[in-house]
C-alpha cells in the first residue's frame, strides 16, 4: 500500500470497519492519483460532525463525511492529502435507508471523501458524473455494488 493512514476513533460505535479495511479503501482511491499519500480519518459522533459541518459548510446538521484538504506551502512537497471526518451514525442511517450494507456504504464514504481531497467535486452535473463514475469503478474493483444504482 502507498497510503499511510492515521485512524482516530473519537466516539464509540459498534461494528466499525477495521483499520485494515479503512486503509484498503483509502489506498484504492488515493493510489490511482498519487505515488504516496498520508491521510487522517477521524470517526466522530453526530455532535462533532454537526459542529464541523456548521463551522465549515454553514450546514447545521451532522453529515456522513467531511473532507479537509491539506495544501502545502509553496516549495514544500509532502504526501499529506488531508483529513476525513466520518460520522458512523449517519453512515449507518443512510445504509439502512438505501438498503446497503453498512461496510459497503462506509467504503463508499471513504472513497468519496478521498476523491474530494484530490480535488474532485460534484457541484456541477458534469463533475458529478466524473466523480460518480470513478467511485463506481473503484467500488466495483472491491466487489461492491454501484452505490448510485437507484438514481438512474
From Swiss-Prot:
Cofactors named for this entry = Zn(2+)
What Pfam families does the database record attribute to this sequence?
YbeY
A GO MF annotation of the entry reads: zinc ion binding
Q: What does the similarity note say?
A: Belongs to the endoribonuclease YbeY family.
Checking SUPFAM superfamilies in the record gives: Metalloproteases ('zincins'), catalytic domain
- Gene3D superfamilies from the xrefs? Metalloproteases ('zincins'), catalytic domain (3.40.390.30)
Native species of this protein? Pseudoalteromonas translucida (strain TAC 125)
Q: Where does Zn(2+) bind?
A: 112, 116, 122
EC number from the UniProt entry? 3.1.-.-
Name the UniProt key words of this record, in alphabetical order: Cytoplasm, Endonuclease, Hydrolase, Metal-binding, Nuclease, Ribosome biogenesis, rRNA processing, Zinc
- What's a BP term from Gene Ontology annotated to this protein? rRNA processing
Cofactor remark: Binds 1 zinc ion.
| Subcellular locations according to the entry | Cytoplasm
**Which superkingdom does the taxonomy of this entry point to?**
Bacteria
Q: Which GO terms describe its cellular component?
A: cytoplasm
Q: Which InterPro entries match?
A: MetalPrtase_cat_dom_sf_prd, YbeY, YbeY_CS
Q: Which HAMAP family match?
A: Endoribonucl_YbeY
Query: Which NCBIfam families does this entry report, sorted A to Z?
Result: rRNA maturation RNase YbeY
Q: What is this protein called?
A: Endoribonuclease YbeY
Purpose: Single strand-specific metallo-endoribonuclease involved in late-stage 70S ribosome quality control and in maturation of the 3' terminus of the 16S rRNA.
Amino acid at each position: 500500500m502507498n497510503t499511510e493512514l492515521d485512524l482516530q476513533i473519537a466516539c464509540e460505535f459498534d461494528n466499525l470497519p477495521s483499520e485494515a479495511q479503512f486503509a484498503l479503501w483509502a489506498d484504492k482511491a488515493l493510489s490511482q492519483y498519487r505515488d504516496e499519500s498520508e491521510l487522517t480519518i477521524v470517526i466522530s459522533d453526530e455532535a462533532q460532525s454537526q459542529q464541523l459541518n456548521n463551522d465549515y459548510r454553514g450546514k447545521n446538521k451532522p453529515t456522513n463525511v467531511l473532507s479537509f484538504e491539506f495544501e502545502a506551502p509553496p516549495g514544500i512537497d509532502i504526501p499529506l492529502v488531508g483529513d476525513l471526518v466520518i460520522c458512523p451514525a449517519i453512515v449507518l442511517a443512510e445504509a439502512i435507508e438505501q438498503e446497503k450494507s453498512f461496510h459497503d456504504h462506509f467504503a463508499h464514504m471513504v472513497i468519496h471523501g478521498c476523491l474530494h481531497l484530490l480535488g474532485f467535486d460534484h457541484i456541477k452535473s458534469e463533475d458529478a458524473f466524473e466523480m460518480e463514475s470513478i467511485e463506481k469503478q473503484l467500488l466495483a474493483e472491491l466487489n461492491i455494488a454501484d452505490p448510485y444504482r437507484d438514481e438512474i
